[in-house]
Amino acid sequence: MSLFRDDGIVLRTQKLGEADRIITLLTRGHGRVRAVARGVRRTKSKFGARLEPFSHVDVQFFSKGSELVGRGLPLCTQSETIAPYGGGIVTDYARYTAGTAMLETAERFTDHEGEPAVQQYLLLVGALRTLARGEHAPTLVLDAFLLRSLAVNGYAPTFGDCAKCGMPGPNRFFSVGSGGSVCVDCRVPGSVVPSPQALELLGALLTGDWGTADAAEPRYVREGSGLVSAYLHWHLERGLRSLRYVEK
């Protein structure tokens, strides 16, 4: 029997019995973790209020084995709020739908429980903080998070040089299956011809150039979001259910 403590973002919850919940978190030190929180569905449970989606929490776990993950679900025995990001997200539809897509993405990219995914964790914390504060348009924050999540998981798209032969950009065509921008010689059936402005926007979101991103016209934001969605769908093999509700 062992105790573990870690910081985490609550990704989702599901009912268990009459008063309990299974809490899924993305933690700093242990990656994705599922744990049972007892009694949190009772009306007066302050413990349960701290374990809602979007919450950034400091959590203590009790495990029957010497490892946090592997021998049944651990118990979540204590929780302290680090940052209640949900308060700045759930009251606004655009922020809420963007945030929900972020949580689903983070869970999809951490499909092996107990494996540390520090970069993905830090990306999620930063994106939710930015979203909750309303620093940029929710769609831009979401697309930046999706692109960077793809990058830290080894699927970084290119928006200039050819993804196949390396020909210096800008290149006219874009292929999700080829890895992004491609030259005329490397284009494949199904390649599209995005506007230069949309590609510039996506490059800015990937690198954190918010001045360029915030100045983008709505039509290029919509076009860029379509490319991000298609690229993500290709690499995840199936799309995110939550993306269909995101306002573009």
Swiss-Prot record:
The keyword Signal appears for this protein? no
Keywords, A to Z? DNA damage, DNA recombination, DNA repair
Q: Give GO cellular component annotations, separated by semicolons.
A: bacterial nucleoid
Q: Could you tell me which InterPro entries the record lists for this protein?
A: ARFGAP/RecO, DNA_rep/recomb_RecO_N, NA-bd_OB-fold, RecO, RecO_C
Tree of life domain: Bacteria
One example of a Gene Ontology biological process annotation:
double-strand break repair
Question: Would you identify the family this protein belongs to, as annotated?
Answer: Belongs to the RecO family.
Family matches, as PANTHER family: DNA REPAIR PROTEIN RECO
Briefly, what is this protein's role?
Answer: Involved in DNA repair and RecF pathway recombination.
Which NCBIfam families does this chain map to? reco
Q: Return the protein name.
A: DNA repair protein RecO
